[in-house]
Structure formats: C-alpha cells, structure tokens
Design a protein with these regions (language model features):
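Conserved acetyl-CoA-binding loop-helix of GNAT-fold acetyltransferases
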Residues: 104-117, 140-144
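Conserved phosphate-binding and hydrolysis motifs of nucleotide-dependent enzymes
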Residues: 68, 72, 106-108, 146
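Short coil/turn segments at alpha/beta junctions that flank glycine-rich nucleotide-binding fingerprints
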Residues: 105, 122-125
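Extreme N-terminal starter segment of soluble prokaryotic enzymes
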Residues: 2-4
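Active-site acidic-Proline motif in GNAT/NAT acetyltransferases
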Residues: 99-101, 105, 133-134
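C-terminal "cap" of GNAT-fold acetyltransferases
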Residues: 87-91, 125-128, 132-139, 143-145, ...
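Short acidic-aromatic loop segments in the C-terminal HATPase_c
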Residues: 97, 147-148
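Acetyl-CoA-dependent GNAT
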Residues: 7-13, 17-30, 38-101, 112-114, ...
Length: 177
C-alpha cells in the first residue's frame, strides 16, 4: 500500500467537501442531533467556505491518497489563520480527517509527519490541535504521536456547545526520525 500526500487544489473542492462531510458524519454523527450536524455541514463545508480556507495564505491542505483514492486529508494553519491565538511559534493541525475504511493503516501517522515537516520548515517549535473530549480513539492516537493536553476550548456544533481538548506536541531536531 502506497500513501501519497498531495496538496489540495481549487479543482478538488467538491471532493474535499465530500470527504469532510463523510468523515465528520462517521465520527460525530452517532453522538449529535441531525439538525446540528446539517447546520455544521452547511456552514463549515460549503464550497465557498472551503474555497476561502483553501486560498488563505497561512493555511495548507493535503490529501492522503492510497492507490489513487482519497483516504483523508490534513489542514494546517500558522499565524493569524490559527483558530486560537497560540503564538508565533506554533502550527495548528485544524483537521486531520481519515475515512473510516482507511483508519488504522498509517494514514493519520503519515499526515502528522507531514504537519511536523511543515512546522519544521516554517521554524515552528510546537504543533497543536483540538480534539473532542469524547473522541477517545483520536486522543489515544495523538498520545502515541507525542501530544499532551495543555488546555481546552469550546466548540459550537449547530446549537450544541461542546468541549475540545487542546493538545500540544513540542518539536525538536529528532522529531522526524
């Protein structure tokens, strides 16, 4: 199995939207009201919103592909594109979405490695992300990747307020090895 990580282009927006909704639904659908999910999809994953994010200079998007099929994607932010003010030495992993049928095949690890490469190339010393407090599977994965909880923040999903844990990973020269 070959995992390729490729930049997402504007021509990929429909596919980006489809994968965003599919992965969000698989992860959060069983635990949330349908109306809240639909409101989130319309707000966060409409093509115009995704285009705006894709064209934001301090944001980067990458598809992970397995044998040519999109398996998931990574979205990173630096500077003023970060969803929280975490300082100038940080890179945010805003989204790391892996389709259900591709989970536990090393794709998430490959996307984290890509984020580390981007952070190091930009001379950042830390990577951070938010993960839903009830997503224990993702929390365990991030722990294995060296992330530690440093705080929390609130996340609105439709009308419901939820709590995300803020996880941080410090980088050093050996991080990529």
């Amino acid at each position: 199995m070959t995992i390729e990580v490729q930049p997402i282009r504007e021509a990929d927006l429909a596919n980006l939207r489809r994968v965003s909704i599919e992965t969000f639904e698989a992860t959060f659908g069983p635990y949330n009201e349908e109306a809240d999910l639909q409101q989130h999809y319309q707000r966060a994953y409409n093509v115009d919103q995704l285009r705006q994010e894709l064209l934001t200079p301090n944001s980067r998007f990458f598809f992970a592909k397995v044998d040519g099929e999109v398996a998931g994607y990574l979205k990173t932010n630096v500077g003023d594109a970060q969803s929280e003010a975490m300082g100038t030495q940080t890179l945010e992993v805003e989204r790391i979405y892996v389709r259900l049928k591709f989970q536990r095949q090393g794709i998430g690890t490959r996307l984290i490695k890509k984020a580390v490469q981007l952070a190091q190339a930009a001379h950042k010393s830390q990577i951070w992300l938010g993960v839903w407090e009830n997503n224990k599977k993702a929390q365990r994965f991030y722990e294995t990747q060296g992330f530690k909880q440093v705080g929390d923040h609130r996340f609105r999903l439709g009308k419901a307020m939820q709590r995300d844990l803020i996880l941080m990973k410090r980088l050093n020269k050996e991080t990529l090895n």
